[in-house]
Structure formats: C-alpha cells, structure tokens
Amino acid sequence: ISCTGSKQCYDPCKKKTGCPNAKCMNKSCXCYGC
C-alpha cells in the first residue's frame, strides 16, 4: 500500500490484516499491533 502519511495506512491495515496500528515507511504502509 503506497502512502505519503501514516493516516492513509490505518484503514487499509485494518481491512487487510486487522491490525490497529500502522506507519508509513519508505512510502509504503507497515501494519503492526496485530
């Protein structure tokens, strides 16, 4: 998932993995807190 900010990652991470936390790293989302 490409991104410019961490806020863009929260919904995709919840939908794809169910993880509540997300960070935008190197223009891609990293999901964690699963």
UniProtKB/Swiss-Prot annotation:
Has the structural arrangement of an alpha-helix connected to antiparallel beta-sheets by disulfide bonds (CS-alpha/beta). It is found in: Secreted. Signal peptide: none annotated. One of its GO terms (cellular component) is extracellular region. The modification Cysteine amide is found at residue 34. It comes from the Eukaryota. This is Potassium channel toxin alpha-KTx 6 hetlaxin. Expressed by the venom gland. Keywords: Amidation, Disulfide bond, Ion channel impairing toxin, Potassium channel impairing toxin, Secreted, Toxin, Voltage-gated potassium channel impairing toxin. Belongs to the short scorpion toxin superfamily. Potassium channel inhibitor family. Alpha-KTx 06 subfamily. Pfam families: Toxin_2. The keyword Lyase does not apply. Binds to voltage-gated potassium channels Kv1.3/KCNA3 (IC(50)=0.48 uM) and Kv1.1/KCNA1 (IC(50)=6.7 uM) and inhibits channel activity. The keyword Disulfide bond applies. InterPro entries: Scorpion_toxin-like_sf, Scorpion_toxinS_K_inh. It comes from Heterometrus laoticus (Thai giant scorpion). Contains 4 disulfide bonds. SUPFAM superfamilies: Scorpion toxin-like. One of its GO terms (molecular function) is toxin activity.
